[in-house]
C-alpha cells in the first residue's frame, strides 16, 4: 500500500552545470542534501550539491491518482533527520500533512488538516509539527495553525489565528511560534506551552503597534481575497500595507523579521518590548526569509524581482542582490554551517522549477539545478563527507 501511495520513483544521476566560482568562491568541502517540493506536478526531489556540482539525487511523485493534483506546498525535515513532512494544499475540501522517511521516501503517515495547509515547521524536540492553514481560496474568515503530534500523525489542536495565515517558524527554544496574516497585515505569536495566541503586531506603515491576543476579523487591512496572488501582486499607488508573507525569528530569539511583500521591506520587531525597531529595504516583492545561525545574515527571496537579497543584520545593509535563474523566487533554506543558501524558484508557464545555490561567503550564485514545476517548499537535510 505504501508503494502505491509513493507513485513513481525516478533517479537522476547526471550533475547540472555549475556556475564559475569567482575569486572569493571555493568548491564545497562536503556534500549538501536538500529536499524541495514542486506544487505544479506533485514531485518531491532530493538535491545533492558538492564539489562536482548540483544534481537531483532522486525524486518521486506523491499520491495514487495521476490525474489528481495534490499541490505539495511546504516541506520540513525533522530535527533528527529521519523524516520529512509535506503539506498538500488541495483536497475535498481540505488538504493534508504527509510524513515520509528521508532514507527511502517511504510513506509513514498522513493526516487531514484545514483549508490549504501551507508553510510548516517541526518543533526542535521533534514532537510537534506546526502548519498554517492558508485558506487561499476560501471566504475572508479567521483561519488557523494546526498542531500535529508527529509520532502518531494526529492533529492535537487547531489554534485560531487570523485571515490567510502564512509562514510558520519557531524560535530556537521552541517556546514561541510565529506566523503572519496577509489579510490582517499582522504578525501573530503563539505560546507553544499554552497552544494559544499570546500577541499580535500590526505591520501597516505608520500604524505599527503590538497588542495582546489574536487580531480580529474587523482589523483586516482592506485586501480583496479574490485579488490576492500569493505575493505576486504589486502595491497600488498610495497603498501602505505590508501584506506579510513570512516571519523569521533571529538566532537568539530576541527579534522577529517579517517580510512585507507589498512595501518591499522587512520589519524588525523586538520580542521583549514588542515594538518595531526598524524597517529594512529589500528587493521587489520580498517573500520568504532565512537567517544564518551565527546571527549575521538575513536572506530574502524577492518574488517579483527575480532575485535574492542578502542583508547584514547588524547594519541593515543589503550586501548583495543576486539574480535567480528564472522568475518567481520562492523558498530559501540555509545550510547549518551558514555557507550556502538554497533557493527554490517556481518559474512561469511550462518552465521547470529550479533550485539556485548561493555562496554566502562569495555572495554569488554557484550552481543551479532544474526540478519539477512551481518549486516552492524547501528544507535542508544534512551535510555528508564528499567522496
Q: What do the PLM-derived regions correspond to, one by one?
A:
Residues 5-16:
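Bacterial N-terminal signal peptides
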Amino acid at each position: 500500500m505504501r508503494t502505491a501511495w509513493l507513485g513513481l520513483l525516478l533517479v537522476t544521476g547526471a550533475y547540472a552545470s555549475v556556475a564559475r566560482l569567482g575569486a572569493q568562491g571555493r568548491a564545497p568541502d562536503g556534500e549538501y542534501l536538500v529536499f524541495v517540493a514542486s506544487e505544479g506536478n506533485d514531485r518531491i526531489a532530493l538535491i545533492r550539491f558538492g564539489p562536482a556540482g548540483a544534481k537531483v539525487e532522486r525524486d518521486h511523485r506523491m499520491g495514487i491518482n495521476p490525474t489528481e493534483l495534490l499541490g505539495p506546498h511546504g516541506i520540513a525535515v525533522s530535527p533528527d533527520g529521519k523524516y520529512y513532512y509535506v503539506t498538500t494544499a488541495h483536497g475535498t475540501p481540505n488538504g493534508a500533512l504527509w510524513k515520509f522517511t528521508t532514507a527511502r521516501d517511504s510513506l509513514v503517515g498522513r493526516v487531514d488538516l484545514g483549508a490549504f495547509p501551507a508553510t510548516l515547521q517541526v518543533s526542535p524536540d521533534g514532537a510537534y509539527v506546526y502548519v498554517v492553514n492558508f485558506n487561499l481560496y476560501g471566504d475572508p474568515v479567521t483561519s488557523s495553525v494546526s498542531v500535529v503530534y508527529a509520532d502518531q500523525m494526529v492533529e492535537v489542536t487547531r489554534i485560531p489565528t487570523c485571515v490567510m495565515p502564512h509562514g510558520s517558524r519557531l524560535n530556537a527554544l521552541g517556546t514561541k511560534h510565529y506566523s503572519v496574516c496577509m489579510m490582517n497585515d499582522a504578525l501573530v505569536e503563539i505560546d507553544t506551552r499554552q497552544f494559544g495566541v499570546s500577541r499580535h503586531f500590526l505591520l501597516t506603515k505608520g500604524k505599527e503597534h503590538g497588542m495582546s491576543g489574536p487580531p480580529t476579523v474587523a482589523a483586516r487591512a482592506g485586501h480583496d481575497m479574490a485579488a490576492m496572488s500569493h505575493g505576486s501582486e504589486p502595491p497600488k499607488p498610495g497603498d501602505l500595507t505590508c501584506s506579510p508573507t513570512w516571519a523569521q525569528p533571529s538566532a537568539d530569539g530576541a527579534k522577529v523579521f517579517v517580510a512585507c511583500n507589498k512595501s518591499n521591506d522587512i520589519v524588525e520587531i523586538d520580542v521583549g518590548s514588542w515594538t518595531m525597531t526598524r524597517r529594512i529595504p529589500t528587493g521587489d516583492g520580498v517573500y520568504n526569509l532565512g537567517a544564518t545561525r551565527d546571527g549575521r545574515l538575513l536572506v530574502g527571496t524577492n518574488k517579483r524581482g527575480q532575485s535574492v537579497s542578502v542583508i547584514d543584520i547588524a547594519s541593515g545593509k543589503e550586501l548583495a542582490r543576486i539574480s535567480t535563474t528564472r522568475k518567481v523566487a520562492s523558498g530559501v533554506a540555509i545550510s547549518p554551517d551558514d555557507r550556502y543558501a538554497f533557493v527554490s524558484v517556481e518559474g512561469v508557464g511550462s518552465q521547470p522549477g529550479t533550485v539556485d545555490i548561493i555562496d554566502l561567503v562569495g555572495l554569488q550564485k554557484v550552481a543551479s539545478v532544474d526540478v519539477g514545476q512551481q518549486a516552492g517548499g524547501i528544507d535542508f537535510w544534512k551535510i555528508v563527507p564528499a567522496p
